[in-house]
Amino acid sequence: MIFLTLSLVLLTLVAYYINNRSLVSPSILFCGGMTIASFIAWINQKTWNLELDIRTLLVITLGAVEFILVGYITNFIFNIIYSRTRTQKMVPYNGIPEYINKRFRSVLLIQLIILCVAIFTIRQTTGISNLMSAINYINYIQNGFIKGQINLPSYFGIILLFNNAAGIMAGYVFLENIIVKRKFDFILFSNLLLGLATPLLTGARGDSIVFLIALTILGYFIVKEQNNWNSANTKYVVVGIIGVILFVFVFEWSASLVGRNMENSNLGEYISTYMGAEIANLNEFIKNRSFPIKGEIFGQQTFVTILPTLSRVFQFTLPDYKLDIPFQILNGHNTGNVATMYYSWLYDFGYMGIGILTIVVSSVGEVCYKFAKQSNGFRIIKLIYSYIGALIALSFFSNRFFENLNVNFLYMIILWIVLKYILFRREKNA
């Protein structure tokens, strides 16, 4: 484990310097997440009786090397093409006019109405009047802890998506007010909080985590556009570490809110399970199972949220199947049922899948990052990259990239475009 951890630390440093010391480039987000997970797994090596298989070591390290190389090549090609179409020059930061802040009051009203509708829908669908109990019930069914079926209305997911999309957009404006204008706007902060909290209504904290990471990336963009992209990052690293520590405590507390059993878990064990056990679980999968595993349909583990949309578009029957993500018990300790993004890829496509899908994730992330970095002020592409960057940062946890980049993400982009058109229009006298 120590060799894996040191290798990932070295690769993270390489990614940092070849990306002009940016803390939010795809390579840094990917390698940084894997490094943290590896370090925590190393600490728990004896606890979990973790004996790292050479194949696991190669999958993780070579996967990281490939991710960095693909990102570097994509960046090189992008710079060649981009330099031919646009002359690089320094421009002042394009701030958001004050009147736009006031328009988010209407958005807040819509978000509050959606929150009330969502709560009413949850209670009506589950038949449980207590909201926390209803949320816990939904969470238990969705995770397969209890048998049952929840048939939420088709509009439910869309209205929650609106709150999330509006929250991220308001979050950018809020952060600009804090960073550039040194001003705290309560309305924008409320927009942000509703966007952050709304996913918890289904008992899922994953989208709230993506939300927080996306806001961190957006804040970094705003800060760097005020200064220089090559300036030192020491204070941002310190702030980031403090933020992570605070987040861990809040994250543990939120577990009971969405129905997770915390009675037999301490903070250290909890952190280890969510931020390091993925390496151990991947190692168990590689050691004990043969792959790729032939399923009922192509890519059923990797493209689980994309296949339903494709089945409707191309009119093919999608078999009813369940994800094969068993919970692991290592040396008497529950290490959960997630095993990095590599688990799904190996399960469906074997080692070849890692080679191909790493190219997809790295190149898509790098292109979006470059467009976001080249833009000035508020742009939709920054919101898009902040979301994609958050998914890449969570690669150490699970296959978030392909799980979240589905039709709902397209709806989110459409919502951002519509909201920008409505909220960011110039005033007649502006």
State where each predicted segment sits.
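N-terminal "leader" segments that precede or initiate the main folded domain
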Residues: 1-101, 188-195, 211-254, 399-430
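Hydrophobic alpha-helical transmembrane segments
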Residues: 2-20, 66, 70, 107-119, 172-179, 194-202, 345-347, ...
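Alpha-helical transmembrane segments of integral membrane proteins, especially early/N-terminal helices
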Residues: 19-37, 71, 116-127, 207, ...
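Membrane-interface helix-loop-helix junctions at transmembrane boundaries of multi-pass membrane enzymes
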Residues: 20-25, 172-188, 370-383
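Membrane-embedded catalytic interface detector for glycan/lipid assembly enzymes
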Residues: 80-236, 244-258
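Small-residue-enriched transmembrane helix-hairpin modules in multi-pass membrane proteins
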Residues: 137-156, 241-364
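Hydrophobic alpha-helical segments
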Residues: 334-430
